[in-house]
Structures are given as structure tokens and as C-alpha cells.
Amino acid sequence: MINMATITIDDDVYKELLKLKGRKSVSEFIKELLEERKRKNLDVFMIAFGSRSEEDVEKLKKELKEAEKWMQSLIQV
């Protein structure tokens, strides 16, 4: 079962969103934007912490996944 939520955005923002999303659903488009942002954040993270040990990197990845789960739980409320 997929949880759904309703969001409210200004009309001008919605019109721009429709132009940008093309044939994708709004959900697909937003999901892609979020994935792109995650990738960019990971790139910055790797630049900043690339000299860490493999153990430190794995620990940080685990903490980031936990933070992401927590953030997702907030979105689903």
C-alpha cells in the first residue's frame, strides 16, 4: 500500500512544475529531483570526507540512511 499526501503550492509554481515535468507524473518528477539532490549531497560529502577510513565511511553511510528514514517518516505524517 502506498501512502499518499496532499500538498499545496502556489498556482505559478504549479504551472512551472507542469512545464518541467513533461510526461512524468508529479510524484515521479519530484522523486527524481530528490534523488538528484541526494547524489549531489553525496558528491559534496565525498569531497569533504573522502580521506576518511573505510570504517568511518560505512559508519557515516549508516547514520545517513537512518537520518533519511527519519526524514521520510516526517514526510509521511
Curated annotation (Swiss-Prot):
Keywords: Toxin-antitoxin system
Keyword Secreted applies: no
Source taxon at top rank: Archaea
Name of a matching Pfam family: VAPB_antitox
Family statement: Belongs to the UPF0330 family.
Function: Possibly the antitoxin component of a type II toxin-antitoxin (TA) system. Its cognate toxin is VapC3 (Potential).
Name this polypeptide is given: Putative antitoxin VapB3
